[in-house]
Amino acid sequence: MSNRIVVVVTGITSGIAFADMLAVNTALPFIQRGFGVDAADAHWIAEIYLLFVASVMMTGGALADRWGTRTVLTVGMSLFTVSSLLCALSGSTGELIGARGLQGMSAALMAPASMALINASFPPGERGKAIGTWAAVSSLMIPFGPLIGGVAVDYATWHWIFFLNLPIGVVVLCLMRFVPVPAYENRHTRPIDWFGACLSILTLGALVFGLLEASRRGFSSVLVQLSFLAGGVSLVVFIFSQRVITHPMLPLQMLSRNRFMALSVMTLLLFGGFQSGLYFLPFLMAQGLGYSALESGAAGLPIALCVIAFSQLVGKKVDQLGPRVFLIAGPLCIAAGLAWLSRIEPHWHYFPEVGIGILAIAVGTGLVVTPLTALAVAALGPQNSGLASGINNSISRVGMLIGIAVMVVVLTGVFRSTLIDTMAMSELPAASRQAILENVAQLAELKWPQDLDSDRVALLSVARTVAFLQGIGQVMLLAATMVMCSVFLVPWASLRAREDQSR
């Protein structure tokens, strides 16, 4: 019974953090309209959460190894509940952004602690099955994110996205009282490297901020380049500090382990392609194919359902057969689905055309999530499972941000070049052409100058949809390539601990 509570509690805490992010993304246009702010301010309501999650995650994992997974998970869930209330009561954009930052920080404590608690509560022979069940419980919550966001803005207000977190938080905190002391937790006693923790947050925060801004301003922006420079300098200082300090947060000898490095690069490529590709799925559905916000939000539902359906079975098989076959089959299915979506046409429907690609991605996700999670948590040994989980989670977020930043550049470039060709054929006046090119970053929401006649507007509107879908197609192809490349790391990522140490 106690082990079931562990799985339920960790699954809910991990799932609610991701579901809340998806719900806010769905409701973002309506939040923007409600506050009457520009797009840049509205985007930071969503992105400040991701910034804190990515930058604090590694520190959260290190704290779990030092203070205990139960303690850090309880603190994280408490902060998440309080910050959700602050979000719901926010009366301005600034208040909401601040509360969302606190919410992201709490999620950065919950995610690595939940994975490490699973690892510490079950014997090695049962961890695959336990992680599979954890993934199923966590994934069960994820599809509710876009649905709750859509229902809230359609039938109530966006505030209810955050109010609904409160009863969930209270229930989880009550259940935490019944979570036993983890039987396999090897909590270390070395002092916390606060200087290293601050440097890691600064490094990841600066790099993530640069990636977020690069998706809007481009990589040539001075602000973006300064962010990358600050992140690079702090990274050098962080590495130097970890070499000379007595009790470093990240002992650098860990980086020499083949399995850990291969897992890190594999995670970067897999999630950089997979999650950034899925980031554009609602845009494909809503702006490319004309589906409603609720329909677009529900488009990825099969992915969560497949993770739920496959996780326990895959977890059992991983314990019996090892992870290698799943680490190959999963990414291959995901890459095939993304490659299929790269062929998108304006006449496609969800059934069957888009659904074929989604189903392949869903099956691949169901196959790869459990073994990759199990390997990531165990990569640095039982005393560092929280740190390993935090690093793996941070890498997956950074990979997604790198993918999105690059893919926005690709999408905008393809969209722009296609529109230029169409404008050349339609012989637009120079002033109208310039006005369109100045606003090309609006992509499928691009508006036409008022002086154009109806025939030209009709021609350009068709060209806008075609150009947008061509850009999305290139994005999906790039995402598929990144996922495919991750497969080449499997021989090293799936090394056993003894093999890894002998190399």
Q: Residue spans of the language-model regions?
A:
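Hydrophobic/small/kink-forming positions within alpha-helical transmembrane segments
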Residues: 54-55, 85, 140-143, 147, ...
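Central cavity-lining transmembrane alpha-helices of secondary-active solute carriers
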Residues: 47-61, 111, 115, 301-313
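12-transmembrane solute porter fold
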Residues: 7-26, 39, 45, 195, ...
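C-terminal membrane-cytosol helix-exit motif in multi-pass small-molecule transporters
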Residues: 166-185, 202-212, 230-244, 489-494
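Helix-loop-helix hairpins in multi-pass membrane proteins, especially solute transporters
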Residues: 57-195, 222
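Extracellular/periplasmic helix-loop-helix junction of adjacent transmembrane segments
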Residues: 27-56, 95-98, 294-298
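Interfacial helix-cap and linker-helix signal at transmembrane-aqueous boundaries
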Residues: 31-32, 63-64, 148-156, 211, ...
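Hydrophobic transmembrane architecture of multi-pass small-molecule transporters
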Residues: 397-491, 503
